[in-house]
């Protein structure tokens, strides 16, 4: 929310010109009087800068939440000294109110803020997985013995605005705010005066707007956000940090109109990590060492891009940490029109290569700073409270006519918290501005089965704007009800300067309802899950059309009842999307049809297990001149169904993709009888392809890349380099196959898990079904007796059993875990592919101030011996008993997670032998020696591709499945590539001569003889 910054423009310009030691000018209070919110809690502290106001503020925070779990706290003008960490409950927003912006002050040398990292204000979270205990307490609380649950991927709406943070002298460990948030949370209109403190924000999330960081060791230090979505920083400044303005990794940092001054480093990506980093209109002034420090070169997760960056007295634009290579500026002042580093995909149908692209030109002087990306709201004195106009907002009275009358009479309307019932279209004036302060509890909603929205007919939205309008919609929730076929939340025809910000489309996660009922209260039982849950049965939630455009920032659209979350059609008016989350739809999340001149910075989609197995993330039709940067296409870990492509293009051209991230893994924090901890759940069903051009029948298999330009419609696309071996399809028609192994005769065994079938394929007999009992088999191996050792997900700790594929169908041997024992002839089974990440647990060492790297985590975890193992009846195979993490019920309706269950299959070796595995969290293939208890030690990176699987042939060649199959010599040099019609999931050698490379994809089995 941006209010009244324009009055500061001249002062800011003068300050910037005053010299390199100038600081950001103090901004006025954006809420000079308290908004009329009868349910808000006002802090009753002293506010004199001397008294300890910790208790007063905490009491207000603790009492703010209403029965829906949301609320607001008003902090009046004053200086509030605190002596311990303040905890903000989930769903609570803090607004500074009064003629001057209030300050939360950490007094000089406050005990507890001298060592490690200690946070003044922590935004907390709820018990997302109903654990009871707190699996990973926040480690930066003062006092340290206080147990606090961190914000997490289920923490929405929390915010702080119009409050300054100040750190007094002698607090080198102090951080201002921990903001590890999910959607619809923000910090705005703030100034962090950090002195000798550690950082302004430690652990960031969602969006920060119009925030200014002065001093400190760092302005922001952060790992990835709690849901692993993007973090967007808009209209903000950094000045005078001692080490770097921003230190981060994996946070998908997206910057728009950010200025960094008087510091050694602008943005530092931590050692051993990458990031999807995108900066638009970023200024670097007096940045002595590097504008950006890039780590993890030649890794797919390192995606660095800038557009229209400006620099003055900043000689090095980019420095590469490992190689020491630099990309230098040109002269004292220069412009970086474009910069990109990472895996570059030359065109559709091709694989990527690592490259640096930089377009830098010298300037005689820097131009003036651009206008804010988020326009100001009007001053408060112009707001008209709708409650003074006869509008009730009690969730019962029909407010439609009264709201329309108010819109017609007043350009600026303020909606206090409440549920405003709407039964017909509300049409905005060309200059209408509608404002709320908390979308979860300030909703315009349509009641279920409203007569005007029933049956077959054209779209009838809650709000409709006029073509070319100069409108603003801010801080409101819009809910179209459960059953209203003609409904849409917002039909937007407004012009380029219009703004939609802090708006939530209700219907997904975090949806309080006016009737107090669950979203699924009108579920039916036809047998069709889409019909049963009323999915895909309304018009798009947000529909921009007929020349509409403007800026859309911090918008969340997860209403599963709608056909799409964000739909744009028939417009060439420029549009700007910043930090938008569109999720949980049955068919499409984003749809663009006949659209030009739009940019999407940090768009994120998510397909849930129940509503999204068939959903496409981006559907682009008949469109051109588009930019997608820091795009994240995620499918939840519990997904059971494969899906072909995240992005689909139809008759579209001139599209720039920058920093693309397509995945399906997520951290999980819980407690069980083995203790508390975290684990990285990995689905086997991310989108197979990042992009599919339906018109050209071409795909982009790379799921992680820095750059792809979809060129002109009539262009000729070069043919990729030839595959080094032909591929033959052996069988198809499967749901999703993996978990394979071969026997001593070379026959292939594999699992189609959805249908609980264990198959065998051989040249002599073709495809057979060996077993199909309902035992939930996941992975298997063949022992020396040609019996199958099968890992099952059935049971609270999963299970292992053995079967004779030639024996009676009603017999199996259940194998119990036993203490690890050394045996010379025993082969140890290990996952061929691993996922390993530090989500949900801070990785910062509070003494060295270094983060544990992904490689260090991987080496630590795979190098830890397991105490028990599952041994095949003949004693020839041992599967380490990996810890199993349980989510949901203990029967087959719940989920189980472990390194063995996550894997696409197993590899094996004897003690001391070296094997190859992939770490998908780094996308690196390693070799390692098998140690006691299934430990993998003496790890050595082998190749900078490491996705789904790896296999080694009799010549020592190494085959890595990562979109296609990449072939390496034993020395690590790439020899070629085998192209497969579908994405390979598992590869292994078999056949009578052990020279057949079996290739398992979701739906088909292939073979090659390289």
Q: Can you say where each PLM-predicted feature lies in the sequence?
A:
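Extracellular "leader-to-stem" segments immediately downstream of a signal peptide or signal-anchor
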Residues: 4-76, 82, 87-169, 173-176, ...
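Conserved metal-binding segment of the jelly-roll/cupin
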Residues: 72-79, 83-85, 93-95, 414-425, ...
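C-terminal, well-structured subdomains that either form a transmembrane helix-short loop-helix hairpin
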Residues: 414, 419, 576-591, 646-647
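Sequence-structural signature of mature extracellular/luminal beta-sheet repeat domains
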Residues: 711-1010
